[in-house]
């Protein structure tokens, strides 16, 4: 969890995803799908452009405007959508939170033995 200045609310996912990728020594090209909570469509566009997320990897099943924005359950909704993407190995769930805060979580599919 990291953030930006509060006046730039909505783009908190940018430093959060960048920090996560650097920590794991990955690039956005190593990620198969990104679920970015869509409180506002302009926020998703700004974050997508700054992170260089290919459109075919971003909110593959629609964003929160299309699928719903459950108060207090956005993170669970993002992760659930990612878990149903059974053919994607590495995925990220990220969201901007009030005051410029952003968080991001990386998931890697485990196929077992």
Per-segment meaning from a language model:
Residues 1-113:
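Claisen-condensing/thiolase-fold acyl-transfer catalytic domains that form or cleave C-C bonds
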